[in-house]
Curated annotation (Swiss-Prot):
SUPFAM superfamilies cross-referenced by the UniProt entry: F1F0 ATP synthase subunit B, membrane domain
GO annotation, cellular component aspect: plasma membrane; proton-transporting ATP synthase complex
Keywords: ATP synthesis, Cell membrane, CF(0), Hydrogen ion transport, Ion transport, Membrane, Transmembrane, Transmembrane helix, Transport
Pfam family, one: ATP-synt_B
Protein family: Belongs to the ATPase B chain family.
Summary of subunit composition and partner proteins: F-type ATPases have 2 components, F(1) - the catalytic core - and F(0) - the membrane proton channel. F(1) has five subunits: alpha(3), beta(3), gamma(1), delta(1), epsilon(1). F(0) has three main subunits: a(1), b(2) and c(10-14). The alpha and beta chains form an alternating ring which encloses part of the gamma chain. F(1) is attached to F(0) by a central stalk formed by the gamma and epsilon chains, while a peripheral stalk is formed by the delta and b chains.
Protein name: ATP synthase subunit b
Subcellular localization(s) per the UniProt record: Cell membrane
Transmembrane segments: 9-29
Length: 168
């Protein structure tokens, strides 16, 4: 009949029935609750793992892109600096060419001016020599025409100079 379990009397059939129901409940829970629940948990774990992997890949790719951008920015700065240096050198070279051309032109103008002054000086000297010769001949002819005293010669020269001054 009944067995004693902790001092209480419970019929064996009830214990067997309860044990059977408990085991049936465990099997059903495993099949219908823990199985799907564990499947969902496994799927969730895989999903989280995949998301973490994707985030790590995205992070690595972002770091790679940032590094590439930094490298490109660095390269751009180097190219810009080279461009500035070339422009400065070109400006200095162009300045040197312009200054050299200006010096050459100034020297040419100076040489031309010196030659022009020399020509005009020679022409003025030739014209003056011609006038002096003409004046000398004219005075000599006047002196020959009349024998003059010193006072008359001085007066004659002054008159002639006055005549020449008015003719100009």
């Amino acid at each position: 009949m009944p067995t004693l379990l902790l001092g209480a009397s419970i019929p064996f059939g009830t214990i067997a029935y309860t044990l059977f129901i408990f085991l049936l409940l465990l099997v059903m829970l495993r099949k219908f609750a823990w199985g799907p629940l564990m499947g969902i948990m496994k799927e969730r774990e895989e999903h989280v793992t995949n998301e973490i992997d994707a985030a790590e890949r995205s992070n690595a790719e972002a770091k790679k892109l940032v590094e590439e951008q930094r490298e490109m920015l660095k390269q751009s700065r180097v190219e810009a600096q080279e461009l500035i240096e070339r422009a400065k050198k070109q400006a200095v070279d162009q300045k040197d060419v312009i200054v050299a051309a200006a010096k050459e032109e100034a020297e040419s103008i100076k040489t031309s001016a010196v030659q022009e002054i020399q020509r005009e000086k020679e022409q003025a000297i030739a014209a003056l020599q011609e006038q002096v010769a003409s004046l000398s001949v004219h005075i000599a002819s006047k002196v020959i025409e009349k024998e003059l005293k010193e006072e008359d010669q001085v007066k004659l020269i002054r008159d002639y100079i006055k005549e020449v001054g008015e003719a100009r």
